[in-house]
Amino acid sequence: MTQRKTPPFRADHVGSLLRTAPLKEARVKRARNEIDAAALNAVEDREIEKIVRKQEEVGLKLATDGEFRRSWWHFDFFRGLKGVEPITTATGIQFHGVETKHEAIKISGKVEFVGHPQIEHFKFLKAHCRVVPKMCIPAPSTFHFRQGRALVSTDVYPDIDQFFADVGVAWRKAIRAFYDAGCRYLQLDDTAWAMMCDPNEREQSKTRGDDPDKLPAVYAAVTRAALEGKPADMAITMHSCRGNFRSTWIAQGGYEFVAEHLLGKTNLDGYFLEYDNDRAGGFEPLRHFPKGQKQLVLGLVTSKSGRLEPKDDIKRRIEEATKYVSLDQLCLSPQCGFASTEEGNILAEDEQWAKLRMIVELADEVWGQ
């Protein structure tokens, strides 16, 4: 067994990292108008350079910008699309025991990709990487699921199928724009697929006017549309998440409800699946994972706490997964990012880096150096 030279890597990570103290301070000052946008950008640049070096130092073969220029893992990208309007809501997104800021989006025009600030964000990352620069954007399925039909103006889209068609085209153009900027490793971050595995979330989707039994096929189709014409030398993966905010979560349930469509009908190069606790269910749904060149990245190390898992426990879980997927098609990562929003999970930066270092060590021990 060997290490991989192309992404996803044996030791990988989802993308977001805990915001550093200087960055947090600069964001507070910017919110108070004590510094201007250029001053904040300078701090972001400096802190991103530091965390890129740190990722390289712990032995990772990839580096992200930690999403240091974002407040949210998804809304920042959505708001950069034409036809999308930011809104303030009466309540935030409800997690277990905690609620997010009261922000959301609505579709007020035809959805289009006509350039995006995150293209420049990627160019900065690439210019400062000695390893493979990895960019993360939300998946097209996530664009729809949390708000459903209520998200989409019936004046703009009386036919919801046209909405999904435009979304597929917008993401396809985004993928091409990142490729043209030099991106060869792109991840689509998603909550829709894993949340559909929770019966409570499926019932809620009905109240939003959706048919949860049809959504897996719909989301697989829009993902395939987004990937049409993908260059052969570009790896595109998807991370599937049950919610990650201040170390809390939203959904639970194994992948059985979506596994056939998610793993077999989306044309992705790799899949990051959460498997850090019992809420993720067992490995049985992995029987739907196709044999061949695709990679399955097991999220066995939690990003929700600083406790280091015993290495033997992780190795045992990897061995259990090989009942369904060959070891050569497996990789290892944390179950999610460390800071899906700027608030971050409840652990220390040193604990975050210790987890990533351990993942690199485990990859060497399991797959060889």
Label each region the model flagged:
Residues 1-369:
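Domain-level signal for soluble alpha/beta catalytic cores
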